[in-house]
UniProtKB/Swiss-Prot annotation:
Residues 1-22 form a transit peptide. It comes from the Eukaryota. This is ATP synthase F(1) complex subunit delta, mitochondrial. The gene is Atp5f1d. InterPro entries: ATP_F1_dsu/esu_C_sf, ATP_synth_F1_dsu/esu, ATP_synth_F1_dsu/esu_N, ATPD_C_metazoa, ATPsynth_dsu/esu_N. Component of the ATP synthase complex composed at least of ATP5F1A/subunit alpha, ATP5F1B/subunit beta, ATP5MC1/subunit c (homooctomer), MT-ATP6/subunit a, MT-ATP8/subunit 8, ATP5ME/subunit e, ATP5MF/subunit f, ATP5MG/subunit g, ATP5MK/subunit k, ATP5MJ/subunit j, ATP5F1C/subunit gamma, ATP5F1D/subunit delta, ATP5F1E/subunit epsilon, ATP5PF/subunit F6, ATP5PB/subunit b, ATP5PD/subunit d, ATP5PO/subunit OSCP.
Length: 168
């Protein structure tokens, strides 16, 4: 329950009273995958990479560790950490993406939704720039003014370490 002090704010009250509506495409149920198939949707705020595509396997980096997802995987919801998402398609091709964060949902019907805060193909990234950003962040860590600044720098370090690892 929200604290009463927040409810007195006119903007918040108006926000809480708004009716929620959905786009037709979002309200339509996802097509179920056939036996032994997995329906995969992968998107970022700026781009849709896969839209209910049948794929063989998806490898994802999560806060609890990296794992592969196949058809009939146990349902789960995981938070993504910076790292590589590897998609193995039915025709045998493999595509690698770098994600900064996000979530992955595996459903009982073998449908998988991966929503990334940021996602790019590896060919869009520069190893030299990632190394330079990593070195800069590491040098700034000791001079962090407070815990908040230190936490922000640590996040930059982790993201750039994952970038360097993905590109090497």
């Amino acid at each position: 329950m929200l604290p009463a002090s927040l409810l007195r704010h006119p903007g918040l009250r108006r926000l809480m009273l708004q009716a929620r509506t959905y786009a037709e495409a979002a309200a339509a149920p996802a097509p179920a995958a056939g036996p032994g198939q997995m329906s995969f949707t992968f998107a970022s705020p700026t781009q849709v990479f896969f839209d209910s595509a049948n794929v063989k396997q998806v490898d994802v980096p999560t806060l609890t560790g990296a794992f592969g997802i196949l058809a009939s995987h146990v349902p789960t919801l995981q938070v993504l950490r910076p790292g590589l998402v590897v998609v193995h398609t039915e025709d045998g091709t493999t595509t690698k993406y770098f994600v900064s964060s996000g979530s992955v949902t595996v459903n009982a019907d073998s449908s998988v939704q991966l929503l990334a805060e940021e996602a790019v193909t590896l060919d869009m990234l520069d190893l030299g720039a990632a190394r330079a950003n990593l070195e800069k962040a590491q040098s700034e860590l000791s001079g962090a003014a407070d815990e908040a600044a230190r936490a922000e720098i640590q996040i930059r370090i982790e993201a750039n370490e994952a970038l360097v690892k993905a590109l090497e």
